């Protein structure tokens, strides 16, 4: 069976089960109080809106996807200030066009832009390198690792691949919750964990996860963030060391209805048609893998106060031990 047909068929089963669970949770009033404010790119509203019924005719139309050159996790502005958004978008415009420089005021912003690009413009992150002593006179240098014409071809292939992911599992009228769960299952259905990657010289990046069928945690997490941002759902990376410091792991924090949730599509690769690691609270995330809450590195930028991004809402708890 074609992978995308499989994704669509499974989406129906997943959404039916998830919506039933969510309605059950709403009826018993489980709720939380995560960080509030304008954290969502899409219009989500209350839980009732998240689970609203979409007309059948609208549900059959393909998702009206258009590539968005400017997407960025909102949490980066908390770390670097509001001005980083425009600086990063200037970088995006330059990098997508294959230009060799972009306006950049200082070294902190220059390094931040390349760090942000890992999950917010993976194709540029994969084919550029950070130069020393940048910027110069307010201009940051962009150096590509492949010939310019080849790079431009890679950019177009990347755009086409993002469209493949999104239109393959989403329909017009899908609300933010549906986009979040559908893209989650699309990744977990189509990717295999690359156990050999850490022993090789492969360049690990979210770009590889999006373009190929094999990846590891930091690649899968970044891929999921980017797909969500492209569909107007705010999400960011999150990582931590295990309590005994024996391993590091990276996953995703997603905002739905003003609440933060932990999503771990990498761990889900080892489960059987379930959502054990979907919509986790801080406590559940800590339990699954023994990653102490105090170790959580929100947006992977070192310095954001984890308590300001607390994930405490338990609406998805019924899913964690459910299989279908």
Q: Which role fits each region the language model picked out?
A:
Residues 152-209:
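Secondary-structure boundary elements
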Residues 122, 167-171, 185-193, 225, ...:
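Sec-exported extracytoplasmic/periplasmic mature domains
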Residues 2-4, 10-11, 26-175, 289-324:
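N-terminal accessory/pre-domain segments preceding catalytic cores
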């Amino acid at each position: 069976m074609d992978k995308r047909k499989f994704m669509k068929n499974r989406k129906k089963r997943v959404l039916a089960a998830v919506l039933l669970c969510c309605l059950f949770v709403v009826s018993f009033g489980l709720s939380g109080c995560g960080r509030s404010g304008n954290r969502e790119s899409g219009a989500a509203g209350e839980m009732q809106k998240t689970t609203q019924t979409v007309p059948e005719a609208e549900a059959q139309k393909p998702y009206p996807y258009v590539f968005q050159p400017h997407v960025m996790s909102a949490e980066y502005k908390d770390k670097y200030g509001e001005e980083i958004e425009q600086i990063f978008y200037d970088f995006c415009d330059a990098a997508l066009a294959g230009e060799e420089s972009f306006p950049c005021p200082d070294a902190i912003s220059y390094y931040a832009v390349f760090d942000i690009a890992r999950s917010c413009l993976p194709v540029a992150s994969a084919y550029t390198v950070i130069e020393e002593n940048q910027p110069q006179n307010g201009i940051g240098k962009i150096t590509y690792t492949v010939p310019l014409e080849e790079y431009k071809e890679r950019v177009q292939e990347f755009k086409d691949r993002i469209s493949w992911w999104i239109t393959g599992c989403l329909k017009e009228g899908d609300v933010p919750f549906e986009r979040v769960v559908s893209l989650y299952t699309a990744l977990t259905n189509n990717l295999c964990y690359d156990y050999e990657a850490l022993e090789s010289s492969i360049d690990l990046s979210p770009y590889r996860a999006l373009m190929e069928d094999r990846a590891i945690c930091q690649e899968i997490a970044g891929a999921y963030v980017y797909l969500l941002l492209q569909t107007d759902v705010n999400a960011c990376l999150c990582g931590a060391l295990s309590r005994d410091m024996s391993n590091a792991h990276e996953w995703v924090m997603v905002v739905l209805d003003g609440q933060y949730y932990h999503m771990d599509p990498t761990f889900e690769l080892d489960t059987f048609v379930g959502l054990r690691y979907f919509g986790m609270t801080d406590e559940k995330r800590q339990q699954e893998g023994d990653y102490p809450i105090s170790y959580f590195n929100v947006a992977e930028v070192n310095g954001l106060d984890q308590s300001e991004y607390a994930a405490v809402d338990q609406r998805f708890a019924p899913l964690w031990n459910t299989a279908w």
